[in-house]
C-alpha cells in the first residue's frame, strides 16, 4: 500500500547480539555513534581499511567495541546477528546482501533502502522512555526534526512518571485484564490533568 509505513518497530538488546559495521569513515562514525548513544554496551565489531580517529576515540570509551583496521572479508560476517554497511561500494553491498539473505542475518545498508532489512530510525530517549521515529527510508531529515521536536516536548521528569507507574502496577492485584483496566484509568486521569 502506497503512502503507509508498514515497518514493524523492534527494540533490540544490542548487548546480547553481535553487530558488524563495515566502514570507518563519516557514515561509519554516524552509525556507531547512534548505536552506542542508545546502547552503550552494544557488542560491535567495526572493520574498515581506514578508521577515522573519532571512531577510535569512541571505541576507546567502550570496551565492547572492537576495531579491525583492514579490508573487509566475507567471513567477518561469521557469528554476527546484525550487519551495517557504511561504505560507498554498491557492488560490495549487493554481494554482502545476497550472502546475509542466505544466512537469515539482518542487514542495513546506509542510504540504500532497497538493500535493507531494517532502517535505523531517529531515537528519542528520556530516562526509560524510548521512542523510535521512521519515515520508511524516505526522509531521515524529517525523522531527525521529529526527534528534536519530541525531545523538547517530553517533560524532563518522564522517568519519575514511569517509576510511579511501575509502583502502581506492582501494587495492583487481580488478573491481567483488571490490571490493564486500572492502569488505563490512572493514565487517562493523568492525561486529563495535563489538558
Predicted regions and their residues:
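Residue-level detector of alpha-helix initiation sites
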Residues: 26-27, 91, 137
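ADP-ribose/adenylate-binding Rossmann-like module
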Residues: 82-88, 93-119
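An accessory alpha-helical subdomain
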Residues: 137-195
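NAD(P)-binding Rossmann-fold cofactor-contacting core
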Residues: 30, 38-58
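A short, basic/flexible loop-to-alpha-helix module at the beginning of a structural domain
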Residues: 1-14, 120-121
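Glycine-rich adenosine-cofactor-binding loop
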Residues: 10-33, 164-176
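Glycine-rich, highly charged phosphate/nucleotide-binding loops
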Residues: 60-76
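E1/E1-like adenylate-forming module used to activate ubiquitin-like modifiers
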Residues: 106-159
